[in-house]
Design a protein with these regions (language model features):
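Active-site-adjacent structural elements in enzyme catalytic cores
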Residues: 1-218
């Protein structure tokens, strides 16, 4: 919660507005660390700021309540590989490298959290599960989108991050036989290898099913 956060990070008015509106939820805040912070340099990579998120998942929140310290919890994927949205994906990706898995079922949203830098002027560093229009409305001003693969200051800025390991193209209408097609909405088409992310084109449902679909294809 925000009280434990204050022990390690400096908070500001913009953070308070977003925290009250969207946390717990799919938003990650970049905040300045306090000089007396006890967060390990292995977590911060010796940087003076920290990425913080408040999970909404009931089981994970119960786990956090039993701890008297924050938990470093990166996404369940190897760098440049697909994110896992359920236990089967984690096992496929990591195999015997992980001894224990806390199974909370399939991810509710299915996409990474939206990352917003609040150290200076608010800026989006990674698009994700929270609509930036909602963030803009809450703050009351325009937000910069600073997604620069060359700087790579946040997860997801690399062009290969979360990639399926096979070529991926957008808006393809015709192709060879060894190609799979992913459709947002279910429709009657004459294609053998096609998958749909939502029965009626619901974007929230499509987002939830995207990574699972890519994992099936690869």
């Amino acid at each position: 919660n925000i009280n434990s956060l204050k022990e390690d990070c400096l908070i500001n008015d913009n953070f308070i507005k977003l925290y009250k509106k969207f946390s717990p939820g799919p938003i990650t805040y970049i905040l300045n660390l306090k000089k007396n912070s006890k967060i390990s340099e292995y977590v911060t990579n010796k940087k003076k700021n920290l990425a913080v998120r408040f999970s909404k998942h009931k089981i994970f929140r119960e786990l956090l309540k039993k701890l008297d310290y924050p938990l470093a919890a990166p996404s369940a994927n190897i760098t440049t590989k697909l994110s896992s949205v359920d236990v089967s994906g984690v096992r496929e990706e990591f195999g015997s490298k992980i001894k224990y898995i806390l199974d909370g079922g399939k991810c509710i949203i299915g996409l990474e959290s939206t990352i917003i830098d609040l150290v200076n002027k608010p800026a989006i560093l990674r698009l994700g599960g929270l609509d930036i229009l909602k963030i803009k409305k809450t703050l009351g001003f325009k937000i910069d989108i600073n997604i620069n693969p060359k700087k790579n200051v946040a997860p997801g800025q690399s062009r290969l991050h979360y990639s399926p390991g096979i070529p991926l193209k957008m808006n393809v209408k015709k192709s060879k036989n060894d190609v799979a097609f992913i459709l947002i909405k279910k429709r009657k088409i004459r294609l053998n290898n096609h998958y749909h992310l939502s029965a009626n084109g619901n974007l929230d449902e499509a987002a939830k099913n995207l990574y699972s679909c890519l994992r099936k294809i690869k």
